[in-house]
């Protein structure tokens, strides 16, 4: 559905979603401003709806229909990003579901709409997992490396799925084991150390976006690091749209740099503060860990600035302009600094810390 590179890692800011559980300490950024996901491309798999909860055969019914109005879910082509690692631990299925993270939490990033949710993982395991057209298996059929295993975590780790699992007429919620390749059933309120949340991001409205609807932006960390690596990272934005200049939270400053300054230099030559709107035509942002300076030109209109002249200021600090005691012009009294040549508006005495240019 899209021209992104399958198997490539892209980063998403999930910091504002309040995902339940304990954040996986092995993520490159535990503040969740930079969470890695792997683009799987388009898969044909079933997805469940909330009505499937507590229905024994809901996965099978969804796996056998392409009717989007089907009660429990349906099978269709869709494009996914799979979390590159477990995101949260010690979290129950019901806790996630109560907050909308099992069947779909609306999420918009850089003008692209997604749903963040658990994948379907199958509901029974005899000699193989069924239904086989679940999302987990369809992703692994493309490339097993699209779902990585973290050896630093409990080897028995299971990732919550959407599906129900029944054993001796008792309902369990399904977790999927990467290492063992099988299913594991838990009570829906179980939240011990081997239950994890590893979501997918599904791109919504792919036909509206079109094949070229997504665009990749490269972030050059400029000597800084993310999770110990100084390599460039990539984010996904809407083509022919705008995106938000990313946060510096979660990034590590260059060695020996103890300042607090941060801004992005765009491939268009302009400077951007985190939170600024950036055109998607700006395909690279380079992190700058230094003061952002703006030039200042003071026109004394025939007078003389004897003291406290300024030619530039630092964003975040601002500056105080010369006052009457700093100015001199014979037979004249200083009336203040104005931003317009016709002296309209009120005089300016300072450049604010957030003033730009």
Where do the language-model regions lie?
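GGW-centered surface loops in extracellular recognition modules
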Residues: 1-70, 74-81, 198-210
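C-terminal, surface-exposed recognition/capping segments
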Residues: 1-2, 6-9, 37-39, 44, ...
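Secondary-structure capping and domain/repeat boundary segments
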Residues: 4-11, 16, 207-357
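Surface-exposed beta-strand edges and their flanking turn/coil or helix-capping segments
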Residues: 49-52, 94-97, 232-234, 311
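Secondary-structure transition/turn motif
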Residues: 83-88, 277
């Amino acid at each position: 559905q899209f021209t992104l590179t399958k198997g490539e890692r892209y980063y998403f800011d999930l910091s504002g979603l309040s995902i339940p559980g304990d954040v996986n300490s092995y993520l490159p950024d535990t503040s969740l401003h930079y969470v890695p996901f792997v683009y799987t491309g388009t898969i044909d798999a079933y997805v469940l709806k909330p009505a499937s909860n507590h229905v024994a055969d809901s996965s099978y019914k969804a796996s056998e229909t392409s009717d989007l109005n089907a009660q429990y879910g349906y099978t269709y082509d869709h494009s996914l990003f799979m979390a590159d690692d477990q995101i949260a631990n010690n979290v129950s299925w019901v806790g996630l579901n109560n907050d909308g993270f099992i069947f779909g939490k609306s999420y918009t990033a850089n003008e692209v709409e997604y749903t963040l949710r658990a994948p379907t993982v199958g509901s029974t395991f005899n000699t193989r997992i069924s239904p086989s057209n679940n999302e987990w298996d369809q992703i692994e059929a493309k490339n097993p490396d699209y779902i990585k295993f973290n050896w630093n975590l409990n080897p028995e780790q299971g990732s919550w799925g959407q599906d129900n699992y029944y054993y001796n007429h008792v309902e369990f919620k399904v977790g999927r084991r990467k290492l063992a390749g099988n299913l594991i059933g838990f009570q829906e309120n179980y939240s011990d150390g081997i239950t994890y949340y590893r979501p997918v991001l599904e791109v919504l409205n792919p036909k509206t976006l079109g094949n070229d609807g997504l665009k990749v932006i490269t972030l050059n960390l400029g000597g800084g690091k993310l999770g110990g690596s100084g390599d460039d990272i990539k984010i996904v934005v809407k083509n022919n749209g705008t995106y938000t200049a990313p946060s510096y939270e979660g990034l590590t400053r260059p060695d020996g740099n103890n300042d607090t300054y941060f801004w992005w230099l765009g491939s268009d030559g302009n400077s951007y503060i985190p939170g600024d709107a950036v055109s998607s035509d700006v395909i690279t942002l380079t992190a700058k860990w230094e003061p952002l300076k703006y030039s200042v030109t003071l026109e004394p209109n025939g007078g003389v600035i004897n003291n406290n002249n300024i030619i530039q200021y630092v964003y975040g600090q601002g500056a105080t302009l010369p006052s009457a005691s700093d100015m001199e012009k014979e037979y004249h009294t200083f009336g203040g600094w104005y931003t317009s040549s016709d002296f309209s508006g009120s005089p300016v005495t300072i450049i604010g810390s957030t003033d730009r240019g």
